[in-house]
Regions:
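N-acyltransferase acceptor-side catalytic subdomain
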Residues: 1-374
Length: 374
């Protein structure tokens, strides 16, 4: 069977229904999300993210794809390779540009070599390797891979890096109190105290699904979102128009939570969800209320998952405090191909040392699990 492998320069060059047929129930990987990033200039010319999606057709049908980008920096990736770039620079070599398969600004595990056919996944990998050779690129990277993509990259002898994120599992809880009943006494008590303090402060939280989000709600959320970046003295990755775009194109996948105090909005969090998983993505506050972050980013979302029968709440990277809120650690993987043999050897040695430390860290987190021991 013959395949036609194409490298597009825009998501407008692939039909949304064809792309989405490959990524069922993956809202952060759907055509609407990826094209919104491009259409609202979060990626593209001048951003350091140039989209080059790989498309594999068989008899005219899209049977494989990968969200490939050409990168000229390492911002917005969440698998950190700055030290590699610095080592290249010290040696008089260019680390950038590099190839990257990822969802921009989104550290979420999922399909990256998007196909259920191993031979098609192998073609995508080989296409990236050929692009590295043809354009004399330093490296290629595939971030936050699911099991299928990980296996294909392992078979192709790509270097693996390990990480840890936190996930909450909705174990058929009937309500939030049912969830709390499964926690150890001290964790249950702490959560109740935190929620009570927020309530006693007079805060009211409103959960708004995508179709009901008004322009003024988006305006307020974006003010909160940008304020978070300003507090960390950095620049927001996403434009205001991006949120308008996803609000219009994928409203069934969006949950906005706004906190109000004395009739005024003071904080907001944005979640994106599918049938099986909810992803906590962005948060910001214009006024400080103790424990409001936990209420808005964790407890409200957990209640929503229980009410909507959503199985997983992906809490993302960092934040060991998530353990005390019912989250458990889960491993993450990324895969890397380094063209220079000397750097390939050195980075392999680095990754093996890093992996040993990550195993110890993961085991430590598991020992601190918040649930009752039967």
């Amino acid at each position: 069977m013959s395949f036609d492998i194409q490298i597009a320069t825009s998501y407008s060059q692939v039909k949304a229904q064809d792309w989405d047929a490959l990524v069922t129930d993956s809202p952060l990987l759907c055509h609407a999300f990826l094209s919104a990033l491009e259409e609202t200039k979060c990626v593209g010319e001048g951003t350091g993210w140039q989209p080059y999606p790989i498309l594999v057709y068989e008899l005219g049908k899209l049977v494989g794809a990968a969200p490939l980008y050409l990168k000229v920096h390492s911002y917005g990736e969440y698998v950190f390779d700055w030290s590699w770039a610095e080592a290249y620079e010290r040696s008089g070599l260019n680390y950038y540009p590099k190839l990257l398969v990822a969802i921009p600004f989104t550290p979420i595990t999922g399909a990256r070599l998007i196909s259920n056919k191993p031979d098609v996944q192998a073609m995508i990998i080989r296409t990236m390797e050929l692009q590295m050779q043809q354009y004399d690129l330093s490296s290629a990277h595939v971030l936050f891979t699911d099991e299928s993509s990980s296996e294909a990259l392992k078979v192709s002898n790509w270097l693996r890096r390990d990480g840890v994120q936190f996930r909450w599992h909705n174990d058929h809880f009937s309500d939030f109190d049912d969830f709390l009943s499964h926690l150890s006494h001290d964790k249950r008590k702490k959560i109740k105290q935190e929620r009570k303090k927020v309530t006693n402060a007079g805060v009211i939280c409103k959960r708004i699904k995508g179709a009901d989000i008004r322009p003024q709600d988006w305006d307020f959320f974006y003010e909160c979102y940008t304020n978070t970046y300003l507090e960390h003295r950095s620049t927001p990755y996403l434009t205001r128009s991006f949120f308008d775009e996803i609000g219009t194109s994928m409203p069934k996948n969006i949950l906005l939570i706004i906190a109000e105090l004395d009739g005024r909005s003071i904080a907001a969090s944005l979640n994106i969800y599918g049938q099986q998983s909810l992803y906590g993505r962005y948060w910001g506050a214009l006024e400080y209320v103790p424990n409001l972050h936990f209420e808005l980013c964790y407890y409200q979302a957990q209640e929503f998952c229980i009410a909507e029968n959503i199985k997983y709440f992906e809490g993302g990277a960092q934040g060991e405090h998530k353990l005390a809120r019912g989250f458990l650690p889960r491993p993450t993987f990324s895969y890397h191909k380094i063209a220079n043999p000397d750097f390939d050897k050195a980075i392999n040695e680095f990754a093996h040392r890093e992996a040993s430390g990550m195993v110890a860290y993961y085991n430590e987190l598991e020992e601190r699990a918040p649930f009752k021991i039967n």
